[in-house]
Amino acid sequence: WNSKRAKKYRKINYIPDHWGTSVNVQTMVFGNMGENCVTGVAFTRNPSTGEKELFGEYLINAQGEDVVAGTRTPQYITKKASKEANAKELSMEESMPKVFKEFKKFSKKLEIHYRDMQDIEFTVENNKLWMLQTRSGKRTAKAAIKIAVDMVKEKLISTKEAVLRVDPNILDTLLHPTLDEKAEKKIIATGLPASPGAASGKVT
């Protein structure tokens, strides 16, 4: 507070010396205190397809870092996603129905308030839900178009806002050849995609 740099900054920005520094005091919640505690991340809409459905993952008895670190395999939030992935573990919707119902309600409120698809971080401590953070979620070009169109239909945003929300630069990803999602296929490997589109042929 009394360093030369701090004093200069206050002088430039017209900040009085008598104000002093401020401190944020926040409650710490723990998702790693037992089997009735979880931590997770979720989107209010599917960030890949734009479908209006909760999409996300959670870990039992874990902290936030564990969900994204890749050291443990997270479980799906919804029963539908868990079933589609043939997951053995129960979804949060099945294992914590009351918490899931509450989470779904607050997620909807956040999306309506911010008028955009939300990326939410949450923790459940001893079966009590804590919403930690929310922000506008990143999405694919396909999802961006669907979400924008759907939100106009839902009267959340105007047509002008919808057009402005679709970045022209990402539309290029829609022009690449892709695999038919409905086609029958034999899965030989799984992984995380690093680029848009699909290709076939001999790798040399």
Where are these predicted regions, by residue range?
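Non-catalytic, soluble scaffold/interaction modules
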Residues: 1-204
